Amino acid sequence: MAAPASSHGPSEDSGCLQERKIAAEMMLVDCLTDDQELVSFEDVIVDFTQEEWSSLNPDQRNLYRDVMLENYQNLATVGYQLIKPSLISWLEQEEFSKGQKIVFPEWKLQLETKCSAFQQEFLRGNISSRMQMQTGINRGRELCDGTQYGDFFSELSPLRTDMKTQPAQDNYGCSQYRKDFLMLQRKNCAGEKLSEFSQSEETGMTPVKEKIDTQEKGFECSDCGKSFMSQSHLQTHQRTHSGDKLYEWNECGRSFINSRLAVLIETLNAKKPHRCKECGKGYRYPAYLNIHMRTHTGEKPYECKECGKAFNYSNSFQIHGRTHTGEKPYVCSQCGKAFTQHSGLSIHVRSHTGDKPYGCKECGKAFLTSSRLIQHIRTHTGEKPFVCVKCGKAFAISSNLNGHLKLHAEEKTCECKICGKAFGYLSCLNNHMRTHNAKKSYTCKECGKAFNYSTHLKIHMRIHTGEKPYECKQCGKAFSHSTSFQIHERTHTGEKPYECKECGKAFICPSSFRIHEISHTHTEEKPYKCQQCGKAYSHPRSLRRHERIH
C-alpha cells in the first residue's frame, strides 16, 4: 500500500479538505448501488508497491491518509464495513508519521443472507464494537421475526463475554445459517480465499489469519530478484527500474506508474472549475484564483507602513512585520533562542540534534537545509543561475551576485531630479524619493533629528544608547550598524569587492575605494568642503580633523 501525490500549497488548506471530502464521496457514489450490492474497503483503496510508497514525501502520505480514512468512514456510515481493516488501524497509529513499511492484507466482508430487510437495516451502522453489534442483532431479530432467520438472531443474543473460552458451544445457532450469513475473505493478489471468521472477545468475531509466508511467489524480477505472486504486480514493480509511466494526467501531462494513483489525483482535481488563463492551473474557489493571479500581474496589495515594502500575500506581509516589531514567537526549548518563522526554528533545532537530512548523492556530504544542498550541488554541475543584468556575469550563489552588484552600484546612473543625488539602481532612487515626498514623522527625543521611517529612528537611537547588536563571531567585536559589521567581516574572509579599474587594486569598503580613485586623477580635486569656512580637502578624514577646530 502506498499513497497518492498532491501539490497543494499552504494557502489552500481549507480548499484541500473540501476537495478530499468530495473525492471520497465521488468514489463511494461509484461503488454504492441501488440494490445494495457487495462493497468493501478494497473497492475504494489505492494499491501501490513498496517502491512507490517510499518515493512519496510526507505531504503526499498525509493526503493519502486523509482520503483513505474518509473513504472508510463513509463506508462505515452506510454499513459496508464490519471489521476495521488493518490499513485503517495502521493509518491511525503514530507509526504512519515515521514512514515505516506498510504491508497489510485487506479484509473483505461478504453478506450472503437472503433476508433483504435485514441486509438493508442491520448494516446501517459501523458494527465495530460489542454494543453496536448487539444493537444490530436486536434490530435484525425484529425485522426477521417469523422468518427462517428468526431463530438465528435468538441464538445470537445476548453476546457472551466468554465466547472465546467456549469453543465447543455454537453461539451462532445453526452452522449452515452462520456460514450463509457471515463469510470473511482475506484475499491475496491472486484473489484466493485464505480465511474465515472465528470468535473474539471484543466484537464476537475475529479473522482467523492463515499464514501467507508459504504462498508461492512465482514471478521474480530479473533486475533486483524481488518476487511477486502475480504477473501484474511484477510488471508494475518493473516500471520502477525502467522509469516507464504509462498513465498520464491530462491536466499537467504528469505521468504515473500506477493507474489508480493517476485516477485518484485526477479525481481530487476534477472539481476545479476556475482556471488560470496564463498557466492553466485550476482552483476550486475564485478567491484562490485571484490570489494566484498576483504571480502573473505582479500585484502586491500588502504594503508595510514602516518601510514601504510590498508583498503578494498576507502571510508574507505578516512575517515581514515581525522584523519591525521584533516579535519572535517560535522559541527553541533547548537554548531559548527565538525566531520569527517556524521554518527558522525547525532548521535551528537540527543544530542541537545534529540532524542533516539533505545529503548530496554525488559525494555524500550532508546539509541542514535544502537551500545549502542546492548550492552545493552546483559545485558538481557547474550551474550558475544568478546573472548580473548589467554585465552578464553569472554566479552560483546569490550572495556572490549581491557582492558583485556593489561594484556596479558605484556607477551612479540614476539621479534624483530634486537634489541631484545619484544612485546605482533605480530601486535605490525610488527609496530615496520617499525622503522628499514623505513627512519625517519620527523624531529623536535626544537630539531632535527627524526620520521618514521608524526603523531609521531605531538605528539612529543606537548612537545615544550605545547599543551594538551586531557582534563578530570571530573576534567578538560589536557594531551598531549592519553595514559596518559586514565591512568588518571582510577583514576575516579576505573579501575585497571594490577593485580599481586603473591599477587592479582591491578594497574592503567603498570609501577607501573612492579615496584611491582620486589618486588616479592627478588633480588637486578637493570634493570635501567645510560648511563653516568653505575650506576644501581631498579626503574626508582631513575634513573631519579640520572640523574639530570649529
UniProtKB/Swiss-Prot annotation:
The biological process GO terms on file are: regulation of DNA-templated transcription
Domain named KRAB is located at: 39-110
Tree of life domain: Eukaryota
**CDD domains reported for this sequence:** KRAB_A-box
Gene3D superfamilies referenced in this protein's UniProt entry, alphabetically: 6.10.140.140, Classic Zinc Finger
GO CC field: nucleus
Q: Which InterPro entries match?
A: KRAB, KRAB_dom_sf, Zinc_finger, Znf_C2H2_sf, Znf_C2H2_type
Ranges annotated as C2H2-type zinc finger: 219-241, 274-296, 302-324, 330-352, 358-380, 386-408, 414-436, 442-464, 470-492, 498-522, 528-550
Listed PANTHER family? PR DOMAIN ZINC FINGER PROTEIN, ZINC FINGER PROTEIN 833-RELATED
Q: What is this protein called?
A: Zinc finger protein 426
Q: Gene of origin?
A: Znf426
